[in-house]
Amino acid sequence: MIRKAFVMQVNPDAHEEYQRRHNPIWPELEAVLKSHGAHNYAIYLDKARNLLFATIEIESEERWNAVASTDVCQRWWKYMIDVMPANADNSPVSSELQEVFYLP
């Protein structure tokens, strides 16, 4: 299993809306994530800095990257662009984090 972590941003006035949209996520999005080998996906909100910290375990980089090309992911990104900064393809602006410590 590959552990990943990344940081995204949320608009300052959209904390509650971001949480509402994720509680729960669309069932079809959950199904796509699971079918592409995603496990233990969690997102944490730093309200003071408007940051989202995400962790996930994936089975392979290829399967994880393939999620982006699915119809449901494309629709989700479009749904979220009013609550967080997005790239030109509507994907969330994000930065992958380097793991520096892990205690199994």
From Swiss-Prot:
Pfam families: rhaM. Pathway: Carbohydrate metabolism; L-rhamnose metabolism. The active site is at H22. Keywords: Carbohydrate metabolism, Cytoplasm, Isomerase, Rhamnose metabolism. Substrate binds at Y18, Y41, W76, W77. Coiled coil: none annotated. Its main location: cytoplasm. Its EC number is 5.1.3.32. InterPro entries: Dimeric_a/b-barrel, L-rhamnose_mutarotase, Rham/fucose_mutarotase. It is found in: Cytoplasm. One of its GO terms (biological process) is rhamnose catabolic process. It is an enzyme of class 5 (isomerase). PANTHER family: L-RHAMNOSE MUTAROTASE (PTHR34389:SF2). Homodimer. This is L-rhamnose mutarotase. The gene is rhaM.
